[in-house]
Regions:
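Short, charged/polar connector segments at secondary-structure boundaries
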Residues: 1-78
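Short, charged recognition helix plus adjacent turn
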Residues: 82
Length: 82
């Protein structure tokens, strides 16, 4: 079972391909929701040495950054093994 953790926003790397899907209107809507209701959905990251790589929830991470949050709630997942 996954356990919620607190991750430093500055230590989360967003892959270039994932960054290309960013929708600023969606980021604004999620940021507004986070202000009024808090973070409802954890992000997904995987460990990569001293940092973490974003797996899911780009818009949620960017909303947290826009709000000036230093940390974000998420789940640490394992990298897929091929």
């Amino acid at each position: 079972m996954l356990k919620r953790e607190i991750f430093p926003v500055a230590n989360i790397y967003v892959p270039t391909a994932r960054r290309k899907t960013l929708d600023l209107k969606r980021v604004d809507a999620i940021a507004h929701s986070m202000l009024t209701e808090g973070q409802q959905t954890p992000i997904l990251v995987r460990a990569d040495g001293a940092r973490f790589v974003l797996v899911e929830c780009l818009h949620r991470l960017e909303a947290a950054k826009a709000l000036g949050e230093a940390t974000i709630v998420g789940y640490r997942v394992e990298a897929r093994k091929h």
